[in-house]
Amino acid sequence: MFYTAATALRDFLKQESAGGIVLMFAAVLALIFANTALADTYFSVLATEIAVTVGGGGIEKPALLWINDGLMAVFFFLVGLEVKREVLTGQLSSWKQASLPLIAAFGGIVLPALVFYGINSGTPENLSGWAIPAATDIAFALGILALLGKRVPVALKALLLAIAVIDDIAAIAIIAIFYTPGVELAMLGAAAITLLILSAFGRAKAGSSIPYIVLGIVLWYFVLKSGVHATLAGVALAMTVPLIDRKGNHMLEHMEHALHSWVAFLVVPIFALANAGVSFEGVELSALFAPLPLGIALGLIVGKQVGIFGFAWLAVKTGFAQLPSSVGWLQVWGLSLVAGIGFTMSLFIGNLAFADPAQINAVKIGVLSGSLIAALVGIAILVLGAKAPAAKSADERVQAPA
């Protein structure tokens, strides 16, 4: 089936918005499990060892790590497909289209990290979590915009989407560079050879998805064993998928479209269910003001807000970018707060940054409180800044910010 860039964007917004609502439900369910009589069962299930053996080798991991290392590789594969499409044919394919989201996203990555560092500079053991508040959960953020309906112009959703894609690129780079403790060269070499074979299929524009599935699993195994985080195999695999196969079918967009529902309604909610369960037993309000959770929360609330809005304002005022005609500054301010919903990616990076259960619990408190406050304040500002946009054609409605 033929999918235009506009159709792909509309499908993406629809799926991720609906998925955001499911994600909210999964997060609430995790909190209920972790703070009721079901807590022991909940944490016991996540700690259950699961072994998969093939031939003479195999992998044995707790259920939680199968979700974080295995299932989330599918999520990162979809992220990789979206990034490749946006760079080749979408909102990041030219400077005119990409300038505003690029500059805004840069501010939204740097400022939260600086806020976190400033608050945790006196506690060196926390500094490895500097990237936690730099992330944006696109499913949650678009879910919030979806709840506001027509009060939010499509151009604002497109701007948020572009910022989130750039944010994902940065998160992938951060994970690869800063959260890879050691590398097993033999396994990394095997992964590289597998990736070269996949690239050959991509260059030949092979139209079957079977080689990508089979070799993708092999690539994931080698990357896992190499010491590099296994989810990055998903991103690498996505880079080998051709935009158009030899028969002229839009293979990348077709694959992206086929995966959306699975990721939005299964993969990410399962991740949330497994990772958002923080026990509040014995936790006092003062725990929120400890450096680690406070740095994360303020990074998401203040850092994202000042970074995205401030850099976007400077870019427009200095002539480096242009604000879409249907979007006002009050709406950009609301967007900058909604982008402070870190959730999925923030929790994911938190699990990479820390091994101590107490620190991971503090990360969850910071991410949940910061994301909740950012969402509520962002919604209030977007409601205040709501205006009825003029009717536009389908192409104009999905056109990226210029």
Swiss-Prot record:
InterPro entries: Na/H_antiporter_dom_sf (IPR023171), NhaA (IPR004670)
One family name in Pfam for this protein: Na_H_antiport_1
Compartments it resides in: Cell inner membrane
Membrane-spanning intervals of the chain: 18-38, 63-83, 99-119, 129-149, 158-178, 182-202, 210-230, 258-278, 296-316, 329-349, 365-385
Membrane topology per record: Multi-pass membrane protein
Gene Ontology molecular function terms on file: sodium:proton antiporter activity
Catalytic activity from the UniProt record: Na(+)(in) + 2 H(+)(out) = Na(+)(out) + 2 H(+)(in)
UniProt keyword terms in alphabetical order: Antiport, Cell inner membrane, Cell membrane, Ion transport, Membrane, Sodium, Sodium transport, Transmembrane, Transmembrane helix, Transport
Job of this protein: Na(+)/H(+) antiporter that extrudes sodium in exchange for external protons.
Protein name in UniProt: Na(+)/H(+) antiporter NhaA 2
Organism of origin: Erythrobacter litoralis (strain HTCC2594)
